[in-house]
Amino acid sequence: MKETTSFSQKLKQFVLLFFPIFVTQMSLFAMSFFDTTMSGHASPTDLSGVAIGTSIWIPVSTGLTGILMATTPIVAQLVGSKKKEDVPHVVIQAVYLAICASFVVILIGFFVVSPILNGMRLEEPVERIAAQFLSIIAIGIIPLFTYTVLRGFIDALGKTRTTMIITLLSLPINVILNYLLIFGNFGFPKLGGVGAAIASTATYWCILIITVIIIQTKEPFASFNIFKQLYRPSLSSWIAFLKLGVPIGFAIFFETSIFAAVTLMMSNFSTTTIAAHQAAMNFASLLYMTPLSLAMAMTIAVGFEVGAKRYDNAKQYGLIGIGLALAFALLYSILLYFFDDQIASIYTTDAKVHHLAKEFLIFAILFQISDAIATPVQGALRGYKDVNVALIMTLIAYWIIGLPLGYILATYTEWAAKGYWIGLIIGLAFGAAFLLIRLFQVQRKYTTQNSR
């Protein structure tokens, strides 16, 4: 990142920041995408098992990686305020925290996964695949969380192209292992959905190893000497980190877990409905990578400018991010409307699943505008380190408005499973409105401070 003086310079720098993040997020998502689509071509049962397992795993992983994402605004503001010497201590403490969080998640999962799956009254093969999927994914938690911290450090320096290269190097490993283990090609065992979990776990370890090597050997990362000194764990540093990270993580958790909760509630419907819902939701999540990437770029850009006390510049980056998100939302809405048949065909060859997935995809169109506002706005707020109010707003919008409304519509109206999608759409709309109002308040506060 560097200081800019004109809107066109900011737009260029933001796009150069955003594009590698977008490629990185698409590559990471591609692992889940290939897990889902390739499992679906193995059988509807494998697809449903992976869907249930993913619906339990994703909210946990995204919530905790969200906490660790606090690395990005902290380092960005340190770099913006010329305090480079403080960066290694922050990163190492975050790594310690990531490892501790990994062990806590594994321990809790050991006790709660089986009761959760048993209580869902799933078909036996689906429950078995989901349980095995989660057991294997647990082996990849430590590298995934540690990588999240190191990626936050790399991105905060504005070197998002580096994380793009790392994930592009790792993605083929995931795809090849999926091909070998899901379908049993070239003499490997045919493991179905379980093979997808093994492939993802192996890829997480590869990503971590590549990242550590780059930080140790390549500039500008090597000059920070991140691993030169293993600082003692600092409780005060952890608390300061968590004060920022926990609201970020829980805000992300509230948003992602509502989608997972809906998928789990779908267990009351048929395997066909679960599979169709997962296919449509998976593609909607693919499109979500764009506003998510814009949000990450906004956190870096806004954090850098706030650290340098250039608050008008920070505000302009917010406008750029939201404007780009709305443009992409329009494009994706057109894509969903005209190519729903082709999109559904990516996920399944089963006629019933295909037909129902097309109906769910139409609802996904209405996600686009809300995501285009809410997600980038949260990214900007993180750059300002304003995260507590956003946490409350997402809780209200998604869990107090969206999910209960979806349950009522699905249970007591003829909408059935589609009622959950309507509830999600309304919850996301409220969330977008709440968060946008908060961003305006924060920007006004900083602009007023700057004018004094």
UniProtKB/Swiss-Prot annotation:
Transmembrane segments: 13-34, 49-71, 92-114, 129-151, 164-183, 193-215, 240-262, 282-304, 317-339, 359-381, 388-410, 420-442
Protein name: Probable multidrug resistance protein NorM
One Pfam family from the record: MatE
Localization terms from the record: Cell membrane
Any GO CC annotation of this UniProt entry: plasma membrane
GO molecular function terms listed in the Swiss-Prot or TrEMBL record: antiporter activity; xenobiotic transmembrane transporter activity
Similarity annotation: Belongs to the multi antimicrobial extrusion (MATE) (TC 2.A.66.1) family.
Gene Ontology BP annotations: monoatomic ion transport; response to antibiotic
Record's keyword terms, sorted: Antiport, Cell membrane, Ion transport, Membrane, Transmembrane, Transmembrane helix, Transport
Function per UniProt: Multidrug efflux pump.
Xref: InterPro entries: MATE_fam, MATE_MdtK, MdtK-like
